[in-house]
């Protein structure tokens, strides 16, 4: 079964909570109800099962040693620390989006949002921002297809620079 796929419109309630649709709730409950919220640079809130987040953040063999010598690395740690928070899915299937995250991402109580599956988790998007992002994705796919078609139609025996 494919996990964390699809998209659904939801409402942020007056307390800043989002009720997860059954399909996403089932996916999260395969691990447990412990999730990590992370504000993404694209303008969405990523929600990841805790084990997935741990995998995403692995990679630096000695983070403390690197933090001692790298301003850039400390800034990266600061960004992740400030824009990330552990959370639990309630028994009612809701997640509370922290107020600072809502303000940063334009996710207001009473507002419709879009939940988008990403195969490793779910993103919460402001509906307008999601339309903009989806347009970017569609344009990228169109351009990629045009480049592939152009490459397929090139004259045999010529490389892509036009030389033989």
Task: Describe every region a protein language model picked out.
Residues 1-10, 14-15, 24-92, 100-164:
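Flexible "stalk/tail and boundary" regions
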